[in-house]
């Protein structure tokens, strides 16, 4: 094997015709013979290029509605033959097989077919067979064959050939082969995962996951860690699918925090009014509803002004000028919203480093999707926590029942608590958080942290007393003892929402009654680690 290998003969068979004509013209200009199939051949011919049909090469027509067209020794022999192996060369000569030096294939759009909600039979028909077979053959023989599966690599191929007088280097072919194997792996993963869904398999014996590189990051959580951002091909609105209008490149921590922020604010449907969430280290500093988006932002910001500095702001409605004007008053890393007015965009333009992401929608907080966490030697796979409760799900367990206004705050606090790292305690007053206790090892400590945050809010805003006085309290899991509940009551809590289910529920309910609290059980836990 020599490092440089010439490209004399190419087979092109693509479903995505983007850039096809330009590629074909460039190859033809270098004297490369073009082979093709079906619609690809027609497109090339319509552009005035000379193309030889694969059916002419194999001596067999395309058959069975196109299911069989390239599955033939004349094709696979041309892809797999080792050019420096005498036996292979002799077999090629004996059977009239000509080498194929370049394969350009992109696969039937199976993923897109599934995404648009096609029926079972239509999805099956969009599973490519010949394409992956050729890709794997060409990739295995990358010592001599180039395989291109991505339109984004067309320019790189032509540049490589231009730099090497119509040849390509071994290192270049290796990189193409790696990309090709990753593509067929991702394709097979999409098919197998779709079939698992069709069969309603909760835990398939084997499961594959795949991603496409979106961004190479400067570093990971810390500067000594390498990192990259991959997308899974879904169209869920969020940081992976957003348009970045301005600002510096997103960092690993920006992406992680922005995802947490937008998933939280999506709990609040825009038709029910404006909502804002401000996030630091994937935990909410403040979350609020408002009569206007500007009011929602101000209330969320007021919850923890200190922590909001350098935070991520997520909005459930398009950013307007009034809200934009408030946001730029302090340092903010990222703002993510479904849209933005021209006036708001102009205001942000004065802050060149502020990242503005627009999504054209909100993620569905009830859409069932898969969540993963890597552990040493394996992956933990579970359904994303899309659990929700409404008024009819709540069970009043104390002598005192919450008022209508308290019920609204309790449900708001419950939605926020779902997105706080456990142990989570959230204090809410009038549709806004006033204290968030996150990530403590005991529920008592989380209640203490939330109370301290509320007291600091009072100091920062010059309030006569803690805003936690008369607040609604949410706990992401049951109170194992009454101490955490009583700490929340001492901070000013007037009503409580929690899952229930502790062996000491009776003791906790008794303590709530004695403290004059109203308490409801949800029957659902929201641990978040």
Swiss-Prot record:
Q: Which pathway features in its UniProt record?
A: Purine metabolism; IMP biosynthesis via de novo pathway; 5-formamido-1-(5-phospho-D-ribosyl)imidazole-4-carboxamide from 5-amino-1-(5-phospho-D-ribosyl)imidazole-4-carboxamide (10-formyl THF route): step 1/1; Purine metabolism; IMP biosynthesis via de novo pathway; IMP from 5-formamido-1-(5-phospho-D-ribosyl)imidazole-4-carboxamide: step 1/1
Question: What's a single GO CC term here?
Answer: cytosol
Q: Which UniProt keywords apply?
A: Hydrolase, Multifunctional enzyme, Purine biosynthesis, Transferase
EC number(s) stated in the UniProt entry for this protein: 2.1.2.3, 3.5.4.10
One Pfam family, short name: AICARFT_IMPCHas
The UniProt record lists the keyword DNA damage: no
Residue span(s) of domain MGS-like = 2-149
What are the protein's GO molecular function terms? IMP cyclohydrolase activity; phosphoribosylaminoimidazolecarboxamide formyltransferase activity
Intrachain S-S bonds = none
One Gene Ontology biological process: 'de novo' IMP biosynthetic process
Q: Which catalytic reaction applies to this protein?
A: (6R)-10-formyltetrahydrofolate + 5-amino-1-(5-phospho-beta-D-ribosyl)imidazole-4-carboxamide = 5-formamido-1-(5-phospho-D-ribosyl)imidazole-4-carboxamide + (6S)-5,6,7,8-tetrahydrofolate; IMP + H2O = 5-formamido-1-(5-phospho-D-ribosyl)imidazole-4-carboxamide
InterPro entries recorded: AICAR_Tfase_dup_dom_sf, Cytidine_deaminase-like, MGS-like_dom, MGS-like_dom_sf, PurH-like
The Swiss-Prot or TrEMBL note on domains reads:
The IMP cyclohydrolase activity resides in the N-terminal region.
**What family does the Swiss-Prot or TrEMBL record give for this protein?**
Belongs to the PurH family.
Q: Which HAMAP family match?
A: PurH (MF_00139)
Its protein name is Bifunctional purine biosynthesis protein PurH
């Amino acid at each position: 094997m020599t490092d440089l290998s010439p490209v004399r003969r190419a087979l092109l068979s693509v479903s995505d015709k983007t850039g096809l004509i330009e590629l074909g013209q460039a190859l033809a200009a270098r004297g490369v013979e073009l082979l093709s199939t079906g619609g690809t051949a027609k497109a090339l011919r319509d552009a005035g290029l000379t193309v030889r049909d694969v059916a002419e090469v194999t001596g067999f027509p395309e058959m069975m509605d196109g299911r069989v067209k390239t599955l033939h020794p004349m094709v696979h022999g041309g892809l797999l033959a080792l050019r420096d192996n005498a036996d292979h060369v002799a077999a090629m000569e004996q059977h009239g097989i000509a080498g194929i030096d370049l394969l350009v294939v992109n696969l039937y759009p199976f993923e897109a077919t599934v995404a648009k909600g096609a029926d079972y039979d239509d999805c099956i028909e969009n599973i490519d067979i010949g394409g992956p077979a050729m890709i794997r053959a060409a990739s295995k023989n990358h010592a001599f064959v180039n395989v291109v599966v991505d339109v984004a690599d067309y320019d790189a191929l032509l540049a490589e050939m231009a730099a090497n007088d119509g040849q390509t280097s071994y290192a270049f072919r290796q990189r193409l082969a790696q990309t090709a194997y990753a593509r067929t792996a991702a394709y097979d993963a999409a098919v197998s995962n779709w079939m698992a869904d069709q069969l309603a398999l909760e835990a398939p014996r084997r499961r594959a996951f795949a991603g496409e590189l979106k961004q190479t990051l400067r570093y990971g959580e810390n500067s000594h860690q390498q990192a990259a951002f991959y997308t899974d091909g879904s169209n869920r609105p969020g940081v992976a699918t957003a348009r970045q209008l301005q600002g510096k490149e997103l960092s690993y921590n920006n992406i992680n925090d922005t995802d947490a922020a937008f998933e939280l604010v999506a709990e609040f449907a825009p038709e029910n009014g404006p909502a804002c969430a401000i996030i630091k280290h994937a935990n909410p500093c403040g979350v609020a509803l408002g009569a206007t988006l500007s009011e929602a932002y101000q209330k969320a910001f007021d919850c923890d002004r200190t922590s909001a500095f350098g935070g991520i702001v997520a909005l459930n409605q398009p950013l307007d000028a009034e809200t934009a004007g408030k946001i730029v008053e302090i340092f903010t890393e990222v703002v993510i919203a479904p849209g933005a007015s021209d006036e708001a965009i102009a205001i942000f333009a004065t802050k060149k480093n502020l990242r503005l992401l627009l999504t054209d929608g909100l993620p569905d907080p009830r859409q069932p999707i898969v969540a993963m966490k890597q552990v040493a030697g394996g992956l933990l796979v579970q359904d994303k926590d899309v659990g929700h409760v409404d008024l009819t799900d709540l069970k009043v367990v104390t002598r005192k029942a919450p008022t209508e206004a308290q019920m609204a705050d309790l449900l708001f606090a419950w939605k926020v608590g779902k997105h706080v790292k456990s142990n989570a305690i959230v204090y809410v007053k009038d549709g806004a958080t006033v204290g968030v206790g996150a990530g403590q090892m005991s529920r008592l400590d989380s209640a203490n942290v939330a109370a301290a945050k509320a007291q600091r809010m009072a100091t920062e805003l010059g309030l006569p007393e803690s805003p936690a006085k008369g607040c609604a309290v949410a706990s992401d899991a049951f109170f194992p003892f009454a101490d955490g509940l009583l700490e929340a009551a001492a901070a000013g809590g007037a009503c409580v929402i929690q899952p229930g289910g502790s062996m000491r529920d009776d003791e906790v309910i008794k303590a709530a009654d004695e403290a004059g609290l109203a308490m409801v059980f949800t029957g659902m836990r929201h641990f978040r680690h």
